[in-house]
């Protein structure tokens, strides 16, 4: 029991013990707290009081105090010096990526250009279409942009023909239009007897003789150029070309071995030579042959159109089916002439390939073209326009400008006048001469007397009153009271054999009056003669609206006009009978079905039976058809009668403003002056004479060619002519479009066989922007003549020490230049790649055509040889300059002609003053002597006129219009003044050789983003040069603001700073209390009449202000930003190059001051060493006042002795640290970047890491100017991206060649370097130092100037610079200046004013002397071009000096 109690009491005891322990622990903790409180409140204050009550003494002497003070001051200086005064070096950490430079040869520069070039070189070529339809669609583009109905009409009767390798096809273009849809066709032309075998043997020697290379070529595949580019010959043909000429014998001329050489073919006894190769997707027929397919109707009745289509149209392939029989018959023929005439002129056979040796030809038959002519006559005129456009742009341009066969074009007009010499009745001519003779002596002194008949002033009398009664061909006095016959009895044609345009039964009076005057008859007779000459002399040449097809002409583009139709004008023939005759008459021989809508015929037949002749009258009244007399009336209205005095030039050579001249009396002489000798001293040669009844200016009007000749009157006699202006002539042809076909047909009949051959073989290549014309390494089988557009020459080279290829831009080809003759004549591969900068067109001359023409006309070979020789000489000159140059520059800048033909002005965002900018730029271009035109959407629509909304013609008209403007004007400015979605915006971008991208410099949002116009620019992938034009309100650039624009714009290659006022919209302030002024403004806004008056007054004031600004633009200041931009864009830029020379470079400030005083503009600035400093100051502000002050401030800081002493360091790398020098430059330039400079600027430095000369055009200005001024030993090199940069003067102390690469035409080069000591030395083979020291102090020594070690090191360092200076002096266009500053040392910065006055006095005196002697360069916009040679005075320009 007790045990249980004891166990129960155990927890109680345990709880008591734990309670006691807790109590003790709490007491202990309270004791610790008390201890802490006692120490903090009692002990520590007691100890502090005890310590403070003691006395502490420190004994220091004065030296110790000074030392401690100096140490403290040194520490503070070190902290301030390296912590707070090195802010200019923070750009390495902050903007290291921003400071991109063209330095560092290891790193690629000019990123956008290299990237774009490489992209288009590496781009895979577009795949060719693989089916017949795609090939056909490619070839049908030669007709232009056809309507859907016309396209279906041409294609629904199309057939195909397959040809194997052992078959030969006679190319008879009368059967239809032929297109190669599969394979490659070889076209051969007949070799005449004049071209003997010896000549062809000589041709074969130009081939390749390397057997190994030919064997390698045999294994390669055929290369093709995309997008109608250079159709290269395959490798087998190139091998045969070289190997087929062994032992002086052409295999192609051997009957047994003709297949071994594709260049020649023997068919029976007739030899053929390869003319061209036509690949799939190209037309086999000539485009001009289409004119023969629109065959005029030969039936006697104009209401039977199906008669002309009755004969079946079949493919004439006699040389395929009956080749053996024909060849056998020809072999037995002994007459060579008969044999030559029997063989076809052109034959076609497939080209042998590895996979297939057959071709498939699609044939559009002649009947299809006849149906198109009948149903859609307007579309027929579109095709004729395309034919004439190609004839002018490709054939005639190439013949005249490149081949030099201008005589063939002259023969055309001579044959025209010989074939039709149509005179006028003598009584009409005598009456006109008598009226002209009564004009009076005062009027006769004028150049020409115009007799243009006003539409209202038709006649002065209702009866004919003849002024001439002499020898009238019409006897009797009744002539004075009856209408005059306009037919000369001598020139009348038998109407039964050939129906003329004027039918006697249907003659309608010319005027609105009942009777005609003598002048009216004269005009009608002249027009009739002109029509007969140009081919409009038969009724079948005009369109006839036929009854069966009239209902089909529902399209707006196919409204045919009825001329001379008996249904309208012949009352003798019932219309109903004619219709029934037409409907029921079909041809049984039609091999190609002619479809007609039966429902339309049935309804028309019922309609005609019910209405009868009444319908004809209603149709006549409603449609008011055009008659032949209306046409003659229209031409007669625009015709002028002129009397031209003797020895008067009517049309100047190369003039566009010409017309058609019909000689009434007297004669006109045609003179020609060759292009090579076209100058004021050259004399023109008389070509032929146009007598009475002939016409002059035919080619200019019909084809659209500019006048190739000068038209003059004889020295002793004048001429009476009828004149139709070219513009009036073209407008009338557009109105009466059906006249184009007969006129074009007449033109084709006049072309010689040689011209037809050239037209057939020439290729019209269209290369879209960014596509490759020919690639590097391709076989050269033809050369190109640039018709329009621009091509960039790119070469791909392997970079040293890297597997990557480096793309180098070599130059650009523009309008009128030729490409690829050297490779063709040397039978080599393409050495470069050609990329289309914009949509371009070329005329490709195949190698085979060139060889044929060269044997027929040796003058062509001579001319092309001269052209090739000049190109080779220019390339050798460039190569020699590169070989003799001792400088390896890391700059990738190669000279590309900036003479841009087309300039596009494109805004970044909407709302920018594009129109004002364009007006000022165009005015500046005109001020520098450029023939320029500004083209906007309104002007383009005005030119297109009624064709503006015709999709089938608008592109052809636009391309022809743009090509015409490029030929007529030196520069065409495209103004993009439309929204982004507009077609005109895309047209402007695609047409520009150079795109000027306008941007508001203060627009921070657009600077960091991409504008909507820029997005379109990127989307179109244009390769044209793009320059950013930053528009500033004031002539000031915020530091670092330009790089913000350029950082993310890889597509921008350059930039310009332009000062121009921009109107900004006032920002609206928040709502507030309405004032009296606001209420009045609100009332004013509601009054529309006041608003209209205000806008009218405002527009007048703004226009007046704009005119005043444009007038004062060039004369007001030689520092005009628009003049500077115009000179840069026109290769007329003025460059200023300032050389290095230490303190002697202060004279640069004086030279710049003299330039300002004489009003000489500066567009580009470059410099070395101290020249980079002064040039940078001038480029930054373009103000001489600020330059003088800042240069003097820098000189004072550098010449401070104490600053240099404190900057001294232990001379391991240099004597001074460079801190004071760096800070002195930074104090002047601050954080300004080179991109912020107002004028384009560059400086050079010597990269001792890569052993190159680096060119700096971007980055912080102070850093690279300091690098260019880093004299070795005195200053440490500037470290930039791992490379050490020193003074640029070690390699080129006067970088003139670098300025030349940037397109500067006139360069003022100022040299202030030390004179190179070239005293001869002869001190033997050994040299004692003691002897050198003795000779320096010996006044009688012959060798006092023996160099020491430092002199030798300096001379060694400047070896390259000395040679570069001598090369710069010999460079054309460089004006070398050297002020007399040899007496000043390199570090004489303390003599600032003295050196400045030396440079100012020298330059001012020199420029004044040049002005007096007329030796100053003819700077564009500064010197009147026409006044310089005639003693014209220089334009005086003044300026207000401001900071």
Swiss-Prot record:
Record keywords: Endoplasmic reticulum, Hydrolase, Lipid degradation, Lipid metabolism, Membrane, Repeat, Transmembrane, Transmembrane helix
Membrane-traversing stretches: 60-80
Motif (GXGXXG): 1140-1145
Binding positions for a nucleoside 3',5'-cyclic phosphate 1 per the UniProt entry: 619-750
SUPFAM superfamilies: cAMP-binding domain-like (SSF51206), FabD/lysophospholipase-like (SSF52151)
Membrane disposition: Single-pass type I membrane protein
InterPro entries listed in its UniProt record: Acyl_Trfase/lysoPLipase, cNMP-bd_dom, cNMP-bd_dom_sf, NTE, NTE1_P-loop_dom, PNPLA_dom, RmlC-like_jellyroll
Cytoplasmic domain ranges by topology: 81-1443
Activity control, per UniProt: Inhibited by organophosphorus esters.
Recorded superkingdom: Eukaryota
Motif DGA/G, residue range(s) on this chain: 1287-1289
Comp. bias regions, Polar residues: 103-118
Residue positions binding a nucleoside 3',5'-cyclic phosphate 2: 746-871
Subcellular location: Endoplasmic reticulum membrane
Active site per the UniProt annotation: 1169, 1287
Motif GXSXG per UniProt: ranges: 1167-1171
Record-linked Pfam families: cNMP_binding, NTE_Ploop, Patatin
GO molecular function, one term: lysophospholipase activity
CDD domains, per the entry: CAP_ED (cd00038)
Enzyme Commission code(s) on record: 3.1.1.5
Residue spans of biased composition, Acidic residues class: 210-235
Lumenal-facing ranges: 1-59
Family: Belongs to the NTE family.
Function: Intracellular phospholipase B that catalyzes the double deacylation of phosphatidylcholine (PC) to glycerophosphocholine (GroPCho). Plays an important role in membrane lipid homeostasis. Responsible for the rapid PC turnover in response to inositol, elevated temperatures, or when choline is present in the growth medium.
Protein name: Lysophospholipase NTE1
């Amino acid at each position: 029991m007790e045990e249980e109690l004891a166990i129960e009491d155990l927890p109680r005891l345990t709880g008591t013990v734990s309670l006691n322990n807790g109590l003790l622990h709490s007491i202990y903790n309270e004791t610790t707290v008390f201890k802490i409180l006692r120490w903090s409140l009692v002990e520590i204050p007691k100890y502090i009081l005890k310590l403070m009550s003691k006395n502490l003494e420190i004994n220091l002497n004065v030296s110790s105090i000074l030392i401690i003070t100096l140490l403290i001051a040194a520490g503070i200086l070190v902290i301030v010096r390296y912590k707070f005064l090195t802010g200019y070096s923070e750009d390495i950490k902050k903007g290291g990526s921003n400071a991109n430079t063209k330095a560092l040869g290891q790193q690629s520069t000019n990123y956008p250009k290299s990237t774009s070039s490489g992209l288009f070189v590496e781009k895979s070529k577009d795949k060719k279409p693989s089916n017949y339809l795609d090939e056909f669609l490619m070839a049908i583009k030669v007709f232009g942009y056809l309507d859907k109905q016309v396209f279906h009409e041409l294609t629904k009767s199309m057939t195909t023909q397959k040809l194997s390798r052992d078959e030969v096809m006679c190319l008879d273009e009368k059967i239809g239009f032929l297109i190669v849809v599969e394979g490659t066709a070889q076209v051969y032309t007949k070799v005449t007897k004049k071209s003997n075998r010896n000549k062809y043997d000589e041709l074969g020697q130009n081939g390749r003789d390397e057997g190994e290379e030919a064997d390698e070529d045999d294994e390669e595949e055929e290369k093709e150029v995309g997008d109608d580019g250079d159709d290269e010959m395959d490798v087998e043909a190139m091998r045969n070309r070289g190997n087929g000429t062994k032992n002086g014998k052409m295999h192609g001329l051997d009957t047994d071995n003709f297949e071994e050489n594709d260049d020649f073919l023997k068919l029976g006894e007739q030899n053929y030579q390869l003319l061209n190769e036509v690949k799939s997707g190209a037309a086999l027929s000539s485009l001009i042959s289409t004119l023969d397919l629109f065959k005029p109707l030969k039936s006697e009745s104009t209401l039977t159109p199906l008669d002309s289509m009755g004969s079946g149209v079949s493919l004439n392939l006699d040389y395929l089916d009956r080749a053996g029989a024909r060849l056998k018959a020809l072999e037995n023929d002994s007459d060579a002439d008969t044999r030559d005439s029997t063989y076809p002129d052109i034959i076609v056979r497939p080209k042998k390939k590895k996979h297939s040796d057959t071709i498939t030809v699609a044939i559009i038959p002649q009947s299809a073209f006849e149906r198109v002519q009948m149903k859609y006559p307007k579309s027929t005129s579109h095709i004729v326009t395309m034919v004439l456009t190609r004839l002018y742009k490709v054939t005639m341009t190439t013949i005249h400008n490149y081949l030099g066969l201008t005589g063939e074009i002259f023969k055309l007009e001579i044959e025209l006048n010989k074939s039709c010499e149509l005179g006028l009745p003598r009584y009409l001519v005598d009456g006109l001469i008598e009226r002209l003779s009564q004009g009076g002596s005062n009027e006769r002194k004028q150049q020409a007397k115009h007799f243009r008949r006003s539409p209202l002033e038709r006649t002065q009398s209702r009866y004919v009153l003849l002024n001439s009664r002499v020898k009238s061909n019409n006897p009797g006095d009744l002539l004075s009271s009856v209408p005059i016959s306009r037919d000369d009895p001598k020139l009348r044609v038998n109407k039964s054999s050939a129906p003329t345009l004027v039918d006697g039964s249907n003659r309608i009076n010319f005027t609105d009056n009942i009777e005609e005057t003598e002048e009216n008859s004269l005009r009608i007779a002249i027009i009739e003669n002109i029509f007969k000459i140009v081919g409009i002399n038969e009724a079948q040449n005009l369109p006839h609206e036929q009854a069966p097809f009239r209902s089909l002409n529902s399209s707006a583009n196919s409204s045919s006009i009825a001329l001379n139709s008996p249904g309208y004008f012949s009352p003798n023939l019932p219309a109903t009978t004619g219709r029934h005759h037409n409907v029921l008459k079909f041809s049984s021989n039609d091999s190609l079905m002619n479809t007609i809508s039966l429902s339309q015929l049935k309804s028309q037949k019922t309609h005609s039976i019910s209405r009868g002749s009444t319908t004809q009258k209603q149709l006549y009244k409603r449609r008011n058809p055009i008659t032949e007399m209306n046409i003659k009336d229209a031409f007669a209205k625009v015709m002028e009668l002129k009397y031209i005095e003797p020895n008067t030039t009517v049309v100047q050579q190369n003039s566009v403003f010409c017309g058609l001249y019909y000689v009434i009396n007297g004669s006109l002489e045609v003179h020609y002056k060759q292009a090579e000798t076209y100058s004021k001293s050259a004399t023109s040669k008389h070509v032929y004479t146009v007598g009475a009844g002939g016409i002059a200016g035919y080619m200019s009007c019909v084809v659209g060619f500019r006048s190739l000749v000068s038209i003059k009157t004889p020295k002793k006699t004048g001429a009476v002519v009828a004149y139709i202006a070219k513009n009036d002539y073209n407008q009338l042809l557009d109105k009466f479009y059906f006249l184009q076909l007969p006129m074009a047909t007449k033109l084709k009949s006049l072309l010689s066989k040689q011209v037809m051959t050239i037209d057939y073989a020439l290729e019209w290549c269209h290369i879209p922007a960014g596509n490759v014309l020919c690639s590097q390494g391709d076989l050269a089988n033809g050369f190109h003549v640039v018709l329009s557009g621009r091509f960039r020459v790119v070469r791909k080279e392997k970079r040293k020490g890297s597997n990557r290829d480096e793309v180098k831009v070599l130059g650009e080809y523009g309008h009128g230049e030729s490409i690829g003759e050297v490779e063709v004549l040397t039978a080599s591969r393409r050495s470069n790649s050609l990329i289309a900068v914009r949509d371009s067109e070329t005329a490709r001359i195949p190698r085979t055509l060139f060889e044929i023409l060269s044997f027929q006309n040796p003058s062509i070979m001579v001319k092309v040889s001269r052209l090739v020789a000049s190109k080779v000489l220019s390339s050798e000159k460039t190569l020699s300059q590169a070989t003799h140059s001792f400088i390896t520059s890391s700059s990738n800048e190669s000279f590309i002609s900036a003479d841009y033909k087309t300039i596009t002005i494109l805004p970044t965002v909407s709302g920018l003053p594009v129109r004002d900018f364009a007006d000022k730029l165009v005015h500046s271009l005109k001020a520098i002597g450029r023939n320029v035109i500004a083209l906007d959407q309104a002007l383009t629509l005005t030119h297109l006129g009624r064709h503006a909304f015709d999709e089938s013609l608008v592109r052809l008209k636009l391309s022809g219009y743009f090509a015409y403007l490029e030929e007529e004007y030196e520069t065409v400015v495209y103004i993009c003044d439309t929204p982004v979605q507009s077609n005109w915006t895309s047209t402007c971008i695609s047409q520009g050789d150079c795109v000027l991208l306008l941007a508001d410099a203060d627009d921070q949002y657009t600077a960091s983003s991409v504008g909507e116009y820029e997005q379109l620019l990127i989307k179109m992938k244009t390769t044209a040069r793009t320059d950013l034009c930053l528009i500033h309100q004031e002539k000031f650039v915020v530091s670092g603001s330009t790089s913000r624009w350029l950082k993310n714009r890889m597509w921008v290659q350059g930039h310009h700073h332009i000062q121009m006022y921009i109107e900004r919209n006032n920002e609206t302030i928040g709502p507030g209390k309405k004032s009296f002024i606001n209420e009045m403004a609100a009332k004013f806004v509601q009054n529309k009449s006041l608003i209209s008056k205000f806008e009218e007054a405002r527009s007048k004031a703004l226009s007046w202000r704009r005119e005043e600004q444009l007038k004062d633009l060039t004369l007001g200041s030689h520092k005009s930003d628009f003049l500077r931009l115009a000179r840069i864009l026109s290769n007329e830029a003025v460059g200023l190059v300032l050389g290095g020379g230490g303190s002697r470079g202060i004279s640069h400030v004086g030279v710049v001051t003299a330039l300002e005083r004489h009003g000489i503009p500066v567009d580009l600035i470059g410099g070395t060493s101290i020249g980079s400093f002064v040039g940078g100051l001038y480029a930054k502000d373009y103000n001489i006042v600020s330059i003088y002050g800042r240069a003097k401030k820098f000189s004072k800081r550098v010449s401070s002795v104490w600053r240099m002493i404190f900057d001294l360091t232990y001379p391991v790398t240099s004597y001074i640290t460079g801190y004071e020098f760096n800070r002195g430059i930074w104090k002047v330039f601050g954080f300004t970047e080179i991109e912020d400079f107002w004028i384009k600027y560059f400086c050079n430095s010597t990269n001792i890491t890569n052993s190159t000369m680096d060119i700096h055009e971007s980055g912080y200005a102070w850093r690279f100017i300091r690098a260019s001024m880093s004299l070795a030993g005195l200053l440490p090199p500037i470290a930039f991206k791992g490379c050490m940069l020193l003074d640029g003067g070690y390699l080129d102390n006067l970088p003139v060649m670098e300025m030349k690469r940037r397109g500067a035409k006139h360069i003022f080069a100022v040299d202030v370097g030390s004179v190179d000591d070239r005293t001869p030395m002869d001190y033997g083979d050994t040299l004692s130092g003691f002897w050198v020291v003795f000779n320096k102090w010996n006044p009688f020594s012959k060798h006092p100037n023996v160099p020491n070690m430092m002199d030798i090191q300096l001379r060694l360092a400047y070896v390259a610079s000395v040679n570069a200076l001598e090369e710069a002096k010999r460079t054309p266009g460089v004006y070398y200046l050297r002020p007399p500053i040899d007496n000043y040392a390199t570090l004489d910065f303390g003599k600032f004013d003295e050196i400045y006055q030396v440079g100012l006095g020298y330059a001012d005196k020199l420029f004044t002397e040049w002005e007096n002697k007329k030796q100053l360069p003819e700077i564009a916009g500064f010197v009147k071009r026409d006044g310089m040679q005639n003693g014209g005075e220089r334009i005086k320009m003044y300026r207000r000096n401001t900071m």
